[in-house]
């Protein structure tokens, strides 16, 4: 006999499927529509940069700290980027205290890869003395509330925090504080596949019933900087190209809104 939770899950999945047949979603959005997006910057006074993103009911807080350290042996004239993501227990009953979960590590890698592969930060300008001293950039991502699509909210919050980051030169006697040298604004867009449909910004309910999720991080020139698939069901070649087109188009829209929001916050 099925448990009540399994029965509810089946009914919810059937409900979402039936809506999709009519080209509708649970919250009334179209398949290419994001939920309401809100950006706040400089929300942590002791951080070098910070931002909070609210995507629907999903909330993510990012703080950026810089400290000096030694470079890696194979990149002695480049700074270091370290990204951590924490699934706080207050964000969801599914998130428990303890060591980082595998999915948290995976999501941190997606955020980190998008920043690195797009060349978002000019890491050579983080070099203080070649082979001896560089700035290490710590990007700490905290999930405050999970209502779906944590990765996109995390990517957006991380970039917004970096774009408001000041390098604390004065602390090290290196002159005046300067803005972190940014070269690019990558945007991550996650699509969920349910049946034959692809939709951006899946809610928590949509994530629970989707067969596969695909996150695509793109740069301002439309090039793909990173891609991560989650879920057992494969995508056809046609679905993959459709997903890339949708992601690049949506990223351009989000990027424009973000730059406008950042300009207003200065």
Swiss-Prot record:
Pfam families: RNase_PH, RNase_PH_C. Disulfide bonds: none annotated. InterPro entries: ExoRNase_PH_dom1, ExoRNase_PH_dom2, ExoRNase_PH_dom2_sf, Exosome_comp_Rrp42_subfam, PNPase/RNase_PH_dom_sf, Ribosomal_Su5_D2-typ_SF, Rrp42_archaea. Keywords: Cytoplasm, Exosome. It is found in: Cytoplasm. One of its GO terms (molecular function) is mRNA 3'-UTR AU-rich region binding. The keyword Ligase does not apply. One of its GO terms (biological process) is rRNA catabolic process. GO terms for cellular component: cytoplasmic exosome (RNase complex). Its main location: cytoplasm. Belongs to the RNase PH family. Rrp42 subfamily. PANTHER family: EXOSOME COMPLEX COMPONENT RRP42, EXOSOME COMPLEX EXONUCLEASE RIBOSOMAL RNA PROCESSING PROTEIN. Component of the archaeal exosome complex. Forms a hexameric ring-like arrangement composed of 3 Rrp41-Rrp42 heterodimers. The hexameric ring associates with a trimer of Rrp4 and/or Csl4 subunits. Non-catalytic component of the exosome, which is a complex involved in RNA degradation. Contributes to the structuring of the Rrp41 active site. HAMAP family: Exosome_Rrp42 (MF_00622). This is Exosome complex component Rrp42. It comes from Methanosarcina mazei (strain ATCC BAA-159 / DSM 3647 / Goe1 / Go1 / JCM 11833 / OCM 88). The lineage of its organism: Archaea, Methanobacteriati, Methanobacteriota, Stenosarchaea group, Methanomicrobia.
